[in-house]
Amino acid sequence: MIRFARATCVAAAMLVAPLANAADKDAGDVDTFARYAGTWKMQLNYVESAHSKARVESMTVANDCWRSDFFYVCNQIIDGKSRALIVFFYDPVAKRYGSYPIAVGADTVHPATVVVDEKSITFPYDMQDNGKTVHMRIVNTFTTPETLDFKQEYSEDGQKWVTMATGVEHRVSPKAK
């Protein structure tokens, strides 16, 4: 699921009042991430590409999640081991979604933009490859409330996308086990 996932919710004193007013209207937008809660069985198929090796991966991903105001937080447990704490947020002033994925053992936390629509959640990010920026994205398309299609892609120009991996996830429990 969200394995590579990677802005900010810092308000200056002058923004506190507008933010509070926006909270009444827009705080519910963070609920879009509630669809990740629960335990999922995942099957991924990677292809040989410039940024991936051909392989098949299977895993169980349990997302133990909760909501607090503008934040939706998930402890992501992969095959029984806690691997990351992902803090999703909605900024009603900027009208944008983002996340702070905190991986176990990581020295830094990198804020990430998250693109949300009715059927999908996309996690775009960039990486460096020999001094060249490569655009990456993970796209989760919810085909039913209990199933999502996974796709990981890269692009050297931000226009033409090459698929690195595809897969499917099935929710097996509404709660993390």
What is the role of each PLM region?
Residues 1-9:
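Bacterial N-terminal signal peptides that target proteins for export
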Residues 12-15:
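Repetitive helical segments and hydrophobic/amphipathic motifs
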Residues 17-19:
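N-terminal signal peptide c-region/cleavage motif recognized by signal peptidases
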Residues 22-177:
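Hydrophobic small-molecule pocket/channel-lining residues, especially in calycin-type beta-barrels
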